[in-house]
């Protein structure tokens, strides 16, 4: 029983974000379709070879996606919304891009599909749309083509396929209501056809991802797995793959399925290895997800070895990453600015492949010398002064219940704020960022590289802030923002100014489509050495008589969008960040900033996957936000922003944040999200996003008015704000001006109605 290793997937974007650059060049008309396809082929070939050279035995194929792997699955099944279809019914790469972003170099623009978070990660997927009577057929052969590519290169491979039940679970019904699970029998023939094609190619194992099996599923969904896999058995060996949590709740269902192997996440799940072994069929292969695919820390391989060694020789065993390495940066070796000590604490995707090779060899040979040597820096980190700060720990221990309470209830605060700001009905604002032009990015890059001194850099940023204020006043917006020209990323910027964080040069991970982020890493206790946003906010406010919002990223979002420490709880990290940003709120207020926005778009995505664990998370998540905000006086208006959220099941917690104004993403869901606020009788003010900033399409005045009219049917108009869905950083100025002008006009029309 020789143990082999494998990965569940590998980052797609390329070490230098080659895929992003190729996509955006193609969308802009500066590259041909063939040039784009060539970049994809080159990246796939490189990544397979890199994994192989790092010691991976069985390479994943089908993990590459031009936009998103769930969207790829939709195309595989021929599931293309009518508004995105080619006139001749064919599917091509532009079909995919129209679904993802609303437009492509060919075809008519149409509203993009809804986008939401992939389980509890920072990756976004395009939500499949289902209509009653829908038909499916194998049309998009990307998976088969890539299998052919890999086989031609001589690789030993394992195709990756999103499973049918999880695919349906992730989607939404459009039009006439019906149970989307009823489509299972309609999509299974396509899966059977794909598996038959893979069998023809000599494929032995297929990784079929069913991460929905880690959830507390409704009975009907859980019962659907058996007939689904009865239909899929027999053509190839199936590795049923779960990740992001444990499977103990659903183990009885899983063990009855006609598959040949099971992958479990032994990093994020609490499953007992011995229990898994005892309860799974004896002839099943067990793939042990021992290396964390979602973080950047070097693994303690001696600990991983001890966790699994008792199964050696007792059943077929593979060792693997916990999940796809999509969520990890690619290669630590190119990080030349990290000092040796900190660098020794990390492992990126390629290094994690190396860890799998070391672990495989130790388990096969019984020789633990190499894994003991690899794990030595982890012991040193546990005692490093770079990790522990006694003052932070002391302040955290001194928190009282009063620290997270505003001085007065909302009704009292709202009256004080109305008197202070005297805003019109339907007040207009934006979420924070304005277009990050080539000039702005160049300015920041020159400063970072040392090609520009601090004085000239600040002069340049000040000019862009001034331009943003002028643009907003010209458009007639009521509450302004400074535009965030100085910020590359809403989390990275704060991490750069807080002690306890470090940054990489090339630690990019995909967020959605061509968007990549470079998350900071929390390496130690968090504190604020000095004010972060005050100077720029104060400068922007000096340029106008209208209120300018102070802009902060909230503690839970900074935590969720960073690579966290693994030696303390997430609650501890969030509260440390909250205390640091609490001081920032006090300083902004003292500088005359009367409206302060604390963005928490990640509050919901941080929810544990098992609902039984939600209450504990929401309790400390809400407390962290309130700890951050509660220092504000009554006439200081606290805003928060959230996106990609389903709110109905956490409305108690949303209300408990006690923000004076909440702005939310609603345009792609056609204001459906407001149903939750209406049913809950949410008492504070709401800004439902009236257009989708992820698409370059400009909404008409009539479109925005119609959305606001829908909103006013659910929420009293006197408590409604008018704003885009999200920040405008990724958009260009022409479409930004046009969209905001229409938004302001719609608000003015409603005031006069």
From Swiss-Prot:
Function field: Catalyzes the transfer of a methyl group from 5-methyltetrahydrofolate to homocysteine resulting in methionine formation.
- Binding of L-homocysteine occurs at 431-433, 484, 599
Q: Which organism is it from?
A: Klebsiella pneumoniae (strain 342)
Q: In which pathway does it act?
A: Amino-acid biosynthesis; L-methionine biosynthesis via de novo pathway; L-methionine from L-homocysteine (MetE route): step 1/1
| Record protein name field | 5-methyltetrahydropteroyltriglutamate--homocysteine methyltransferase
Provide the binding site for L-methionine: 431-433, 484, 599
EC annotation from Swiss-Prot or TrEMBL:
2.1.1.14
Q: Which residues bind 5-methyltetrahydropteroyltri-L-glutamate?
A: 17-20, 117, 515-516, 561, 605
Question: What family is reported?
Answer: Belongs to the vitamin-B12 independent methionine synthase family.
Repeat in keyword set: yes
Q: Give the note describing cofactor binding and stoichiometry.
A: Binds 1 zinc ion per subunit.
Task: Tell me where on the tree of life, at the top rank, the source sits.
Answer: Bacteria
Query: Signal as a keyword?
Result: no
Cofactor(s) recorded in Swiss-Prot or TrEMBL:
Zn(2+)
InterPro entries in the cross-refs: Cbl-indep_Met_Synth_N, Cobalamin-indep_Met_synthase, Met_Synth_C/arc, UROD/MetE-like_sf
Q: Which GO terms describe its molecular function?
A: 5-methyltetrahydropteroyltriglutamate-homocysteine S-methyltransferase activity; zinc ion binding
Protein's GO biological process: methionine biosynthetic process; methylation
Q: Where does Zn(2+) bind?
A: 641, 643, 665, 726
Give the first-level EC class, as a single word. transferase
């Amino acid at each position: 029983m020789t143990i082999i290793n494998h990965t569940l997937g590998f980052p797609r974007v390329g070490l230098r974000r080659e895929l992003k650059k190729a996509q955006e060049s193609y969308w802009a008309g500066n590259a041909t379709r063939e040039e784009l396809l060539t970049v994809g082929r080159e990246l796939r070939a490189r990544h397979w070879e890199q994994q192989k050279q790092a010691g991976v035995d069985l390479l994943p194929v089908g993990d590459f996606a031009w936009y998103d792997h769930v969207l790829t699955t939709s195309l595989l099944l021929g599931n293309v919304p009518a508004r995105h279809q080619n006139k001749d019914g064919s599917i091509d790469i532009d079909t995919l891009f129209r679904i993802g972003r609303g437009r492509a170099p060919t075809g008519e623009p149409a509203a993009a599909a809804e986008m939401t978070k992939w389980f509890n990660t920072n990756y976004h997927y395009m939500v499949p749309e289902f209509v009653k009577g829908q038909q499916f057929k194998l049309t998009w052969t990307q998976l088969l083509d890539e299998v052919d590519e890999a086989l031609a290169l001589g690789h030993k491979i394992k195709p990756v396929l999103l499973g049918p039940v999880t695919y349906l679970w992730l989607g939404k019904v459009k039009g006439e209501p019906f149970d989307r699970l009823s489509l299972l029998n309609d999509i299974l023939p396509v899966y059977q056809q794909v598996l038959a094609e893979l069998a023809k190619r000599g494929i032995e194992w297929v990784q079929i991802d069913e991460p929905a099996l880690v959830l507390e599923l409704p009975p009907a969904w859980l019962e659907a797995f058996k007939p689904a896999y009865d239909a899929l058995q027999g053509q190839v060996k199936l590795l049923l793959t779960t990740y992001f949590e444990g499977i103990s709740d659903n183990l009885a269902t899983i063990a009855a399925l006609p598959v040949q192997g099971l992958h479990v996440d032994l990093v994020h799940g609490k499953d007992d290895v011995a229990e898994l072994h005892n309860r799974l069929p004896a002839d099943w292969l067990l793939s042990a997800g021992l290396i964390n695919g979602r973080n950047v820390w070097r693994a303690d391989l001696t600990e991983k070895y001890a966790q699994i060694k008792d199964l050696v020789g007792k059943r077929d065993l593979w060792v693997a990453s916990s999940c796809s390495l999509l969520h990890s940066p690619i290669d630590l070796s190119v990080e030349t600015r990290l000092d040796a000590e900190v660098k020794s604490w990390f492992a990126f995707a390629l290094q994690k492949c190396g860890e799998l090779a070391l672990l495989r060899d130790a388990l096969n040979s019984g020789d633990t010398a190499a894994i003991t040597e690899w794990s030595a820096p982890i012991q040193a980190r546990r005692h490093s002064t770079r990790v522990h700060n006694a003052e932070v720990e002391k302040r955290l221990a001194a928190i009282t219940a009063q620290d997270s309470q505003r001085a007065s209830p909302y009704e009292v605060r709202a009256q004080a704020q109305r008197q202070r700001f005297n805003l019109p009905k339907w007040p207009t604002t934006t979420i924070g960022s304005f277009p990050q032009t080539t000039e702005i990015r160049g300015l920041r890059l020159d400063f970072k590289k040392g090609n520009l001194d601090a004085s000239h850099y600040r002069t340049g940023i000040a000019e862009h802030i001034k331009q943003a204020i002028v643009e907003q006043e010209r458009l007639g917006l009521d509450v302004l923002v400074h535009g965030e020209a100085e910020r590359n990323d809403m989390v990275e910027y704060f991490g750069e100014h807080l002690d306890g964080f470090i940054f990489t040069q090339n630690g990019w991970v995909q967020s959605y489509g061509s968007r990549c982020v470079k998350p900071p890493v929390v390496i130690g206790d968090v504190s604020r050495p000095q004010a972060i946003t005050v100077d720029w906010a104060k400068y922007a406010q000096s340029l106008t008589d209208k209120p300018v919002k102070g802009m902060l990223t909230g503690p839970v979002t900074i935590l969720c969008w960073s690579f966290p420490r693994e030696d303390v709880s997430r609650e501890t990290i969030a509260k440390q960040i909250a205390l640091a940003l609490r001081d920032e709120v006090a300083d902004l207020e003292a500088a005359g900033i009367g409206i302060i926005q604390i963005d928490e778009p990640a509050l919901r995505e941080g929810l544990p996957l098992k609902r039984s664990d939600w209450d504990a998370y929401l309790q400390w998540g809400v407390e962290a936000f309130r700890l951050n905000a509660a220092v504000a006086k009554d006439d200081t208006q606290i805003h928060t922003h959230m996106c990609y959220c389903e709110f109905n099941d956490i409305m108690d917690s949303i209300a408990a944040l006690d923000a004076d104004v909440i702005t939310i993403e609603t345009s792609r869901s056609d204001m459906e999200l407001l149903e939750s606020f209406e049913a809950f009788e949410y008492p504070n003010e709401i800004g439902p996003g009236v257009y989708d900033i992820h698409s370059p399409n400009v909404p008409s005045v009539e479109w925005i008015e119609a959305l606001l009219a829908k909103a006013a049917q659910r929420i009293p108009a006197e408590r409604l704000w008018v704003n885009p869905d999200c920040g405008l950083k990724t958009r260009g100025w022409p479409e930004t001006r046009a969209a905001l002008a229409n938004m302001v006009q719609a608000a003015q029309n409603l005031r006069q109605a």
